[in-house]
């Protein structure tokens, strides 16, 4: 059975399965990270990841997030809370709040106070299921003043989440994982084709042979008739 057939069958199962909508705060702990240490000495020879809004922004959306630049040392982590892997992060203050960044940690990390943190109740909801659902929620609906964007943890906790049985959640996750894998493959292929296009575009239009080995090398002596004109002369 192909992935589309499985998806259709799953939709039929969901329609008959008992689904209860619950506030996020009832099925997960919704909180925020720690204030960032200001002393640069706390980051010297650091080994403990400290996730900032900028880290999340660089990735934008990822269910396998680990790309964290700053690392704290033993002194820097004193008094800070460590967040478990599978914690979902999203910006809660600043302009990036409007961009719907969403990631899920794959490593235990310390987290900036500018990020909201969501860690699910393992007995009620699967981490990936919760991430996939939250990924299609537009947090702009919770921001009253777009000129001063901010999200309150209390408002995030009110987001309603559909909770089917764990067995159904697992099947949903399995299919969405397949689509995510397919999307990543297509994006990689598209990036490759884009690089190929750029290479051949530059090769074919390089009349001055600035990149070396371009069209000028292949047609030596035949490009003397090429005339350079201003754009205004030809358009």
Give names to the regions the model predicted:
Residues 1-14, 56, 209-214:
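Accessory (non-catalytic) regions of SAM-dependent nucleic-acid methyltransferases
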Residues 12-34, 218-235:
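Non-catalytic DNA-recognition/assembly elements of restriction-modification systems
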Residues 27-39, 54-85, 232-235:
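Sequence-specific dsDNA recognition surfaces
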Residues 59, 98-99, 120, 135-145, ...:
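Long compositionally biased, domain-poor regions of proteins
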Residues 190, 194, 201-208, 215:
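Coiled-coil heptad-register positions
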């Amino acid at each position: 059975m192909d992935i589309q057939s499985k998806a259709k069958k799953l939709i039929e199962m969901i329609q008959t399965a008992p689904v209860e909508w619950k506030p996020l705060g009832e099925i997960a702990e919704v909180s925020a990270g720690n204030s960032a240490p200001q002393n640069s000495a706390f980051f010297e020879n650091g080994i403990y990841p400290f996730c900032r809004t900028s880290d999340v922004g660089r990735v934008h959306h990822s269910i396998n997030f680990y790309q964290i630049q700053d690392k704290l040392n033993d002194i820097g982590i004193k008094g800070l809370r460590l967040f478990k892997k599978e914690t979902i992060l999203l910006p809660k203050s600043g302009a990036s709040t409007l961009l719907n960044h969403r990631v899920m940690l794959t490593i235990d990390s310390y987290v900036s106070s500018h990020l909201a943190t969501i860690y699910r109740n393992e007995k009620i909801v699967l981490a990936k299921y919760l991430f996939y659902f939250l990924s299609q929620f537009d947090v702009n609906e919770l921001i009253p003043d777009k000129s001063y964007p901010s999200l309150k943890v209390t408002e995030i906790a009110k987001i309603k989440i559909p909770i089917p049985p764990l067995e159904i959640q697992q099947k949903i996750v399995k299919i969405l994982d397949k689509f995510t894998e397919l999307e990543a493959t297509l994006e990689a292929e598209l990036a490759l084709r884009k690089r190929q296009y750029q290479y051949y575009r530059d090769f074919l239009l390089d009349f001055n042979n600035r990149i070396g080995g371009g069209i000028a090398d292949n047609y030596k002596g035949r490009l003397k008739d090429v005339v350079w004109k201003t754009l205004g002369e030809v358009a």
